[in-house]
Amino acid sequence: MRILVLNGPNLNLLGRREPDVYGDVSLKGLAAELMLRAPEDVELTFKQSNHEGDLIDALHDAFDYEGVILNAGAYTHTSIAIRDAISAIAAPVVEVHISNVHARETFRHESKLAAVCIGVITGFGLTSYTLAMHALIEHWRNRHD
């Protein structure tokens, strides 16, 4: 099973940006941790971009994946183009957020993406990614048993 882990704007600053909100582990550290937690039959590919079009291109290329873990960062609350890209692909997408967006500023409470994702995991720190990975694995197994 192949899963794309796609991170959006400012996530390249993990470990340095607002560690009280996002923690002190870098994006590389997150990738390493997630790879350790992945079952042997799961292949993870990691991509990050601060540019909306690059995220859309990565989603378009996700036809070869069985699932996508997407942290679109601030684009979650604004991007209809990313929403449309999610709708255009067959791979199921889980929206993730490190912080609990519902406990933060009001503008972060609305997701333009959630309705076209199979689920949303928010507020569990970097564990949100592990939970999303396991959710995608179970979703895939349930569809292929």
From Swiss-Prot:
Q: Which reaction does it catalyse?
A: 3-dehydroquinate = 3-dehydroshikimate + H2O
Q: Which residues bind substrate?
A: N71, H77, D84, I98, S99, R108
In this UniProt entry, which residues are annotated as the site Transition state stabilizer?
R17
Task: Please give one Pfam family short name.
Answer: DHquinase_II
Annotated coiled-coil positions are none
GO process annotations (BP): amino acid biosynthetic process; aromatic amino acid family biosynthetic process; chorismate biosynthetic process; quinate catabolic process
State which Enzyme Commission number(s) the record gives: 4.2.1.10
Supply the enzyme class, top level.
Answer: lyase
Q: What GO annotations for molecular function exist for this entry?
A: 3-dehydroquinate dehydratase activity
Query: Does the record carry Lyase as a key word?
Result: yes
Which pathway is this protein engaged in? Metabolic intermediate biosynthesis; chorismate biosynthesis; chorismate from D-erythrose 4-phosphate and phosphoenolpyruvate: step 3/7
Q: Which UniProt keywords apply?
A: Amino-acid biosynthesis, Aromatic amino acid biosynthesis, Lyase
**Superkingdom as given in the UniProt entry:** Bacteria
Q: Which residues form the active site?
A: Y22 (proton acceptor), H97 (proton donor)
**Matches recorded under PANTHER family:** CATABOLIC 3-DEHYDROQUINASE
To which protein family does this belong?
A: Belongs to the type-II 3-dehydroquinase family.
Share what the entry says about its subunit structure, partners included: Homododecamer.
Describe the task this protein carries out: Catalyzes a trans-dehydration via an enolate intermediate.
Q: What is this protein called?
A: 3-dehydroquinate dehydratase
Species per Swiss-Prot/TrEMBL record = Exiguobacterium sp. (strain ATCC BAA-1283 / AT1b)
